[in-house]
Curated annotation (Swiss-Prot):
Residues 26-44 have a biased composition (Basic residues). It holds the Pfam family PDE6_gamma. One of its GO terms (molecular function) is cGMP binding. The keyword Acetylation applies. Keywords: Acetylation, cGMP, Hydrolase, Sensory transduction, Vision. Gene3D superfamilies: Retinal cGMP phosphodiesterase, gamma subunit. It comes from Bos taurus. Residues 1-55 are annotated as: Disordered. This is Retinal rod rhodopsin-sensitive cGMP 3',5'-cyclic phosphodiesterase subunit gamma. Oligomer composed of two catalytic chains (alpha and beta), an inhibitory chain (gamma) and the delta chain. Its EC number is 3.1.4.35. The modification N-acetylmethionine is found at residue 1. The gene is PDE6G. GO terms for cellular component: photoreceptor disc membrane; photoreceptor outer segment membrane. It catalyses: 3',5'-cyclic GMP + H2O = GMP + H(+).
Length: 87
């Protein structure tokens, strides 16, 4: 009669015994796209419904160069400008 208790066999939970040994692969790698694609069209420059004449700016013509981007897009909110990468 054997008085010793049976020894428990400890096995690793991560390794399967008897299966083929294959190298583990990491997560798939994704490439960054160079151009961004939006679900909606980006906004157009200029204020909607803006007339040709500006009070106090007579005689300059309608060819006004916009220096600041928020002057061309002042009809939009900041989060809309940031969504399309304007600011």
């Amino acid at each position: 009669m054997n008085l010793e208790p049976p020894k428990a066999e400890i096995r690793s939970a991560t390794r399967v015994m008897g299966g083929p040994v294959t190298p583990r692969k990491g997560p798939p790698k994704f490439k960054q796209r160079q151009t961004r694609q939006f679900k909606s069209k980006p906004p157009k420059k200029g204020v909607q419904g803006f007339g040709d004449d500006i009070p106090g700016m007579e005689g300059l013509g309608t060819d006004i160069t916009v220096i600041c981007p928020w002057e061309a897009f002042n009809h939009l909110e900041l989060h809309e400008l940031a969504q399309y990468g304007i600011i």
